[in-house]
Protein backbone atom coordinates (compact mmCIF):
# COMPACT_ATOMS: atom_id res chain seq x y z
CA UNK A 1 0.00 0.00 0.00
CA UNK A 2 1.05 3.57 -0.55
CA UNK A 3 1.11 6.41 1.98
CA UNK A 4 -1.93 8.54 2.68
CA UNK A 5 -2.07 11.92 0.91
CA UNK A 6 -4.10 14.99 1.87
CA UNK A 7 -7.27 15.60 -0.13
CA UNK A 8 -6.96 19.02 -1.78
CA UNK A 9 -10.54 19.10 -3.08
CA UNK A 10 -13.38 16.81 -1.97
CA UNK A 11 -15.08 13.49 -2.59
CA UNK A 12 -18.54 12.23 -1.74
CA UNK A 13 -19.42 8.57 -1.49
CA UNK A 14 -22.91 7.10 -1.40
CA UNK A 15 -24.02 3.49 -1.22
CA UNK A 16 -27.72 2.80 -1.66
CA UNK A 17 -29.39 -0.35 -0.38
CA UNK A 18 -33.13 -1.10 -0.64
CA UNK A 19 -33.72 -0.18 3.01
CA UNK A 20 -31.02 2.44 3.69
CA UNK A 21 -28.37 4.68 2.21
CA UNK A 22 -24.91 5.56 3.42
CA UNK A 23 -23.41 8.91 2.45
CA UNK A 24 -19.98 10.21 3.40
CA UNK A 25 -17.99 13.33 2.56
CA UNK A 26 -14.22 13.49 2.45
CA UNK A 27 -12.90 17.05 2.37
CA UNK A 28 -9.67 18.95 3.00
CA UNK A 29 -9.23 17.38 6.44
CA UNK A 30 -9.35 13.90 4.91
CA UNK A 31 -6.74 11.74 3.19
CA UNK A 32 -6.57 9.30 0.29
CA UNK A 33 -4.40 6.58 -1.12
CA UNK A 34 -4.53 5.03 -4.56
CA UNK A 35 -2.61 1.96 -5.63
CA UNK A 36 -2.47 -0.72 -8.29
CA UNK A 37 -2.02 -4.46 -7.91
CA UNK A 38 -1.99 -7.36 -10.39
CA UNK A 39 -5.73 -7.24 -11.16
CA UNK A 40 -7.08 -3.86 -10.14
CA UNK A 41 -6.66 -0.40 -8.73
CA UNK A 42 -7.87 0.69 -5.33
CA UNK A 43 -8.92 4.07 -4.01
CA UNK A 44 -9.11 4.51 -0.25
CA UNK A 45 -10.60 7.62 1.36
CA UNK A 46 -10.08 8.25 5.09
CA UNK A 47 -11.65 10.89 7.29
CA UNK A 48 -9.77 10.76 10.61
CA UNK A 49 -10.93 11.95 13.97
CA UNK A 50 -13.94 11.40 16.18
CA UNK A 51 -16.29 10.93 13.21
CA UNK A 52 -13.85 8.58 11.43
CA UNK A 53 -14.97 7.20 8.08
CA UNK A 54 -13.23 5.05 5.53
CA UNK A 55 -14.29 4.02 2.04
CA UNK A 56 -12.35 1.66 -0.23
CA UNK A 57 -13.18 0.84 -3.84
CA UNK A 58 -11.39 -1.83 -5.91
CA UNK A 59 -11.88 -1.59 -9.68
CA UNK A 60 -10.51 -4.17 -12.12
CA UNK A 61 -8.54 -2.78 -15.06
CA UNK A 62 -11.18 -3.54 -17.71
CA UNK A 63 -13.85 -1.66 -15.78
CA UNK A 64 -11.43 1.19 -15.07
CA UNK A 65 -10.78 1.50 -18.82
CA UNK A 66 -14.54 1.61 -19.48
CA UNK A 67 -14.98 4.27 -16.77
CA UNK A 68 -12.18 6.41 -18.23
CA UNK A 69 -13.78 6.23 -21.69
CA UNK A 70 -17.15 7.31 -20.28
CA UNK A 71 -15.52 10.15 -18.33
CA UNK A 72 -13.83 11.34 -21.53
CA UNK A 73 -17.16 11.27 -23.39
CA UNK A 74 -18.90 13.10 -20.58
CA UNK A 75 -16.24 15.82 -20.38
CA UNK A 76 -16.26 16.25 -24.17
CA UNK A 77 -20.04 16.76 -24.20
CA UNK A 78 -20.16 19.51 -21.57
CA UNK A 79 -18.83 23.06 -21.41
CA UNK A 80 -15.07 23.30 -21.04
CA UNK A 81 -13.69 22.97 -17.51
CA UNK A 82 -11.95 25.90 -15.87
CA UNK A 83 -8.21 26.26 -16.50
CA UNK A 84 -7.10 24.88 -13.11
CA UNK A 85 -9.13 21.67 -13.27
CA UNK A 86 -8.31 21.16 -16.96
CA UNK A 87 -4.58 21.48 -16.23
CA UNK A 88 -4.73 19.15 -13.21
CA UNK A 89 -6.60 16.47 -15.16
CA UNK A 90 -4.35 16.75 -18.23
CA UNK A 91 -1.20 16.41 -16.13
CA UNK A 92 -2.60 13.39 -14.29
CA UNK A 93 -3.76 11.77 -17.56
CA UNK A 94 -0.32 12.34 -19.12
CA UNK A 95 1.36 10.74 -16.10
CA UNK A 96 -1.01 7.76 -16.37
CA UNK A 97 -0.19 7.41 -20.09
CA UNK A 98 3.55 7.47 -19.37
CA UNK A 99 3.15 4.79 -16.69
CA UNK A 100 1.49 2.48 -19.24
CA UNK A 101 4.32 2.67 -21.78
CA UNK A 102 6.38 -0.53 -22.22
CA UNK A 103 9.45 -0.58 -20.01
CA UNK A 104 12.90 -1.75 -21.03
CA UNK A 105 13.84 -5.19 -19.75
CA UNK A 106 16.20 -5.00 -16.75
Task: For each feature predicted by the language model, list its residue ranges.
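Positively charged, low-complexity terminal tracts
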Residues: 1-106
Amino acid sequence: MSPLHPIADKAEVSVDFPDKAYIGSFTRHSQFEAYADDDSVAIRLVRPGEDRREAVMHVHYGLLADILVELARSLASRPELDEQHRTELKEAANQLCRSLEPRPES
